[in-house]
Amino acid sequence: MKISLVTWLITALCLMEIEEIDGDTPGNYPVDFQGIYYECIVYNRCERDCKIHGASYGYCYAGVCFCEYLPDENKNFWDVMKKQCDYMNN
């Protein structure tokens, strides 16, 4: 009985981990001041670029940066800069 309970618990934990890794994480692909996606094939600066856009984490996916939990209103570089200027002026 204890062995089957332990086996069930380990299986459940493994499935939860797979869900976390393989689950669809909401996010967005940020664009620079020219409206172009940040490329990351040569220089992977996704974490830095995502932090500029207000996201806490980013990584290279299919040759461009993807930022986890990046809202649509922070996707464009100029929208982020405008928010910062508005914040400084108030």
UniProtKB/Swiss-Prot annotation:
Function, in words: The edited BmKBTx-like may modulate voltage-gated sodium channels (Nav). The non-edited form is able to form a heterodimer. In orthologs, a heterodimer with LVP beta-chain induces lipolysis in rat adipocytes, which is mediated through the beta-2 adrenergic receptor pathway (ADRB2). Since no LVP beta-chains have been identified in the venom of this scorpion, it is possible that this protein is not involved in a lipolysis process.
Free-text note regarding domains: Has the structural arrangement of an alpha-helix connected to antiparallel beta-sheets by disulfide bonds (CS-alpha/beta).
Record PROSITE patterns: LCN_CSAB
One GO MF term attached to the UniProt entry: toxin activity
A Pfam family that the UniProt record links to this protein: Toxin_3
Keywords linked to the UniProt accession: Disulfide bond, Ion channel impairing toxin, Neurotoxin, Secreted, Signal, Toxin, Voltage-gated sodium channel impairing toxin
Quaternary structure (record): Monomer (edited version) and heterodimer (non-edited version) of this alpha chain and a beta chain (AC P0CI43).
Position of the signal peptide: 1-23
Main location (coarse class): secreted
GO cellular component terms attached to this protein's record: extracellular region
Protein name: Putative sodium channel toxin Ts28
Statement: the UniProt record of this protein carries the keyword Protein biosynthesis: no
Stored SUPFAM superfamilies: Scorpion toxin-like (SSF57095)
Compartment(s) of residence: Secreted
CDD domains in the cross-refs: neurotoxins_LC_scorpion
Tissues expressing this chain: Expressed by the venom gland.
Similarity annotation: Belongs to the long (3 C-C) scorpion toxin superfamily.
Cystine pairings recorded for this chain: C40-C60, C46-C65, C50-C67
Domain LCN-type CS-alpha/beta: residue ranges: 26-86
